Amino acid sequence: MPRVALFIPCYVDQLYPSVGMATARLLERLGCEVVFPEDQTCCGQPMANAGFADDAAPLARRYVEVFRSFDHVVCPSGSCTSMVRNHYDGLLPASAGLEKVKRSTFELCEFVVDVLGVKKLDGRYPHKVGLHQSCHGLRELGLGTPSELVAPPGSKVAGLLAGIEGLELVSLTRPDECCGFGGTFAVVEEAVSCLMGRDRIADHVKAGAEIVTGTDVSCLMHMDGLARRRRDPVAFRHVAEILAEATA
């Protein structure tokens, strides 16, 4: 039985705790022993993205201290996972602990497919679903194939969803376009961010999606707020919630 430490991002902890609980339930159903280290804090991504490396470094050190004893760390966020794997080198000196946590930290769907070896989940979810492929997971973790690459298309997240009975993945005009959130980008470039988000929502609505899902609560939150203001006929749910509900 794999022993898995949950790393829960700030958005999930503060605003969407149901996503963390769904992640734990799904992993337990797949035979994992799930633990939650209570000393964990933010991964430091907001500070690093804003250019405050000195403020991000203590949080990166804390992450290494908390999680270096675990062989598997699972996070329901592509962007936070990518922060650990791809950007801690610029904040911390090289060490065995740093290298270990980089190797052992996985996004949820990535862990299910690549580590547990699960390609298909037994479950049912009778809805039309649109998949939003967030930028960090797609382009920094390789959860899918970006359209700008001349390579066979594929998506680990879409593969898991497509195997669920009754779940229909809708076809989008632009399947991997950014939603416009981008953390501080949504604050400093609010107008552009909102226009990008509305474009993504319109693509999903036109395709007939009842529910939009993805690996990052931040992107889903951004689009959900825009959709509710315009009363667009679509809901937003993290992929962990859909997979946990489908396999219940």
Task: Name every feature range the model reports, one short phrase each.
Residues 1-248:
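Iron-sulfur cluster-binding electron-transfer modules in prokaryotic oxidoreductases
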